[in-house]
């Protein structure tokens, strides 16, 4: 009995240490992508100072979006009721980790840095993910659908306003947009419930605030 209890304690401690390391890598470090960056298909052309600052602001927003996606997904995983949903969320989270790494790489190429508020963005999204998960799996999937649809929309806008010569950032966002749409479709087909308009409105308002802040800070 004592040995079993000790094993369980070690198991919980190991899980806590692994989770702490993962959060640190996401928020403060540089997660390693499992796939090469789509940007590698294009040369890293020199941009004008104005275009470079604008591209960096947009890519910082997208980097924050991926920080938020990590928080949302892992908050949901923590309280997911079904193993199938956990697998779905973890698979999507891995693709989001690739996105995060690609955006981080591009930010440094643009001689910029991630948002200083990343711990805040991650914490808020993690809490939202736990809240969504506690509502039940269909509602949790509904948050995935709405989040990914909003991300897809702002990626489309960024594709239109990126500097014309920034092919590397554009290709990253193009691939991300395709994969975000797929995440939304998969969650929808898995039984997502449509979120009430007050919730989707609040999410859109929070996203607008994030974009204003992250573009500069």
UniProtKB/Swiss-Prot annotation:
Topology in membrane: Peripheral membrane protein
GO terms under biological process: ubiquinone biosynthetic process
Record-listed Fe cation 2 binding positions: 96, 148, 180, 183
EC number: 1.14.99.60
Keywords from the named record: Cell membrane, Iron, Membrane, Metal-binding, Monooxygenase, Oxidoreductase, Ubiquinone biosynthesis
Catalytic activity annotation: a 5-methoxy-2-methyl-3-(all-trans-polyprenyl)benzene-1,4-diol + AH2 + O2 = a 3-demethylubiquinol + A + H2O
Residues holding Fe cation 1: 66, 96, 99, 180
Primary location: membrane
Pathway entry: Cofactor biosynthesis; ubiquinone biosynthesis
Domain of life: Bacteria
Function: Catalyzes the hydroxylation of 2-nonaprenyl-3-methyl-6-methoxy-1,4-benzoquinol during ubiquinone biosynthesis.
Family: Belongs to the COQ7 family.
HAMAP family: COQ7
Database matches in PANTHER family: 5-DEMETHOXYUBIQUINONE HYDROXYLASE, MITOCHONDRIAL, COENZYME Q10 BIOSYNTHESIS PROTEIN 7
NCBIfam families for this protein: DMQ_monoox_COQ7
Protein name: 3-demethoxyubiquinol 3-hydroxylase
Gene that encodes the chain: coq7
